[in-house]
Swiss-Prot record:
GO terms for cellular component: mitochondrial small ribosomal subunit. The lineage of its organism: Eukaryota, Fungi, Dikarya, Ascomycota, Saccharomycotina. It is found in: Mitochondrion. Keywords: Mitochondrion, Ribonucleoprotein, Ribosomal protein. The keyword Amino-acid biosynthesis does not apply. It holds the Pfam family MRP-S25. Residues 233-261 are annotated as: Disordered. It comes from the Eukaryota. The keyword NAD does not apply. This is Small ribosomal subunit protein mS23. Disulfide bonds: none annotated. InterPro entries: Ribosomal_mS23_fun (IPR016939). Component of the mitochondrial small ribosomal subunit.
Length: 261
């Protein structure tokens, strides 16, 4: 079956329509497609080198320095399965790895509670290149894990720190100092407000937890009663029928409390 390639000629066809006057108005996508035209090569070509680090993707492991296994045998060459895996990777898209992603993963693994802080979607649209990362605190941007990442990269690019771990530690310690300062300021502001008569009610999360705890307590009380009933039934089957009859006479919704949100 012949590969259909008419869709990739949309730029040339639209240009001809504009030139001949068939189209009076330039489409909104015209300039974008002109800057990044679609590819016309549909043949899969093997990528022998990785585009990120330039390493060969066909190189097999060197077994010359390998030690003997438990049987006392040495492995001197790759087997057919290893050769097959190496050949199949030539046509796969290489994974793009950025140092920023590694720093973000490390930071949030060490500080998982930073993910629980509220965040608005507008913060993701801010360009980090507009800020001066010679200091970690920025005007108009909240202090978060991304500040640590960008501060670390600035220390590496400026030459203040030559090692990645040293730059990350310095940015992390600056983050700790500012975070402690913010928490102290919030605590002092709350104490001053309470001193002047302000009353802080429970938050939505605390209110939900309290309602949930009431349901859990009701369930626990019923579970204990059911466990006692089963134990009594196992020890004295004749007496258990009397208790069971009394339990059936009770209204079903006696211990159920309506949760008003």
């Amino acid at each position: 079956m012949k590969v259909q390639q008419e869709a990739v000629n949309v730029l040339e066809r639209t240009s001809a329509y504009l030139k001949s006057g068939i189209l009076k108005k330039t489409p909104a996508w015209y300039n974008v497609i002109a800057k990044v035209p679609p590819t016309k090569k549909f043949a899969r070509t093997p990528q022998l080198t990785h585009p990120m680090n330039g390493k060969s993707r066909t190189a097999l492991p060197d077994y010359s320095n390998w030690k003997a296994n438990s049987s006392g045998l040495y492995k001197t060459r790759p087997n057919s399965l290893e050769k097959k895996d190496g050949a199949s990777k030539l046509y796969q898209s290489p994974k793009l790895v950025y140092i920023e992603d590694k720093l973000r993963k490390l930071f949030f693994q060490q500080h998982p509670w930073e993910l629980s802080r509220p965040k608005i979607l507008v913060e993701n649209t801010l360009e980090t290149q507009e800020y001066d990362w010679s200091h970690i605190q920025q005007l108009g941007k909240p202090l978060d894990g991304e500040s640590v990442v960008q501060r670390t990269l600035f220390l590496l690019k400026s030459g203040e720190k030559k090692e990645l771990i040293d730059a990350y530690d310095q940015a992390r310690f600056e983050f700790y100092r500012l975070r402690i300062q913010q928490e102290i300021q919030d605590q002092v502001a709350q104490e001053e407000a309470e001193m002047f008569g302000s009353v802080f009610h429970t938050t939505s999360i605390e209110y939900g937890i309290a309602k949930e705890q009431k349901v859990i307590d009701t369930w626990k009380r019923k579970a204990l009663q059911q466990a006692e009933l089963m134990a009594a039934r196992a020890s004295s089957p004749s007496a258990s029928w009397t208790n069971e009859t009394e339990e059936e006479q009770k209204p079903i919704d006696q211990d159920v409390e309506e949760i008003q949100l």
